[in-house]
Amino acid sequence: ASVKNTRFLTRERTDGTDDQWIFLPALGRVKRIAASAGGGSFMGSDFTYADMASTTYDTTEAEHTLIGQETVNGRSAYKIKSIPYDPTAYVQTIIWVDKEHDLPLRVEFFEKDPTTVSKVLTTDDIAFVEGRWITKSVTMTTVATQHSTRVEILQAKYDIPMNGAYFTTTFLETGRLQ
């Protein structure tokens, strides 16, 4: 199915929860994503709506433990176990973070059982853009089916003024500033 002109908006609230909306051209309208649907597949992909908001936790959202140091795809990485205080989508993640660039190289997601990996996110490409290292493409693989979905950042711009109207459901629906 074509995803052309599909638009997705996530806004983090002050209480740490997210509001999410999606515009699907086939429906011609904006649809709010219920918080309970966060674990649902994002447009039939291996990503969930919760994954699209974030795949990591800050220190107020999870307990983080350094459990080792390993090499991932030739890069030296910290291996960190994160257990969220409020496990909604995942009960645990294990993240390999590039020591030099502070980017995730691999993330293992545990949905219900902290001993069984459900999904694996791998970083396929990183790039130096406008003075910072960024993740350019990632692949999420569902372990049970070995099906995967690749997401690629085609363009990134930083430190530019942004009109708040971009972050509204009106813009989501029309694709134009009012």
PLM features: residue spans?
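N-terminal mature ectodomain segment of secretory-pathway/periplasmic proteins
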Residues: 1-26, 65
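Short, solvent-exposed mixed-charge patches
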Residues: 177-178
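Surface-exposed beta-loop interaction hotspot
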Residues: 55-63, 67-69
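Gly/Pro-enriched, hydrophobic low-complexity segments
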Residues: 9-11, 19, 29-33, 40-42, ...
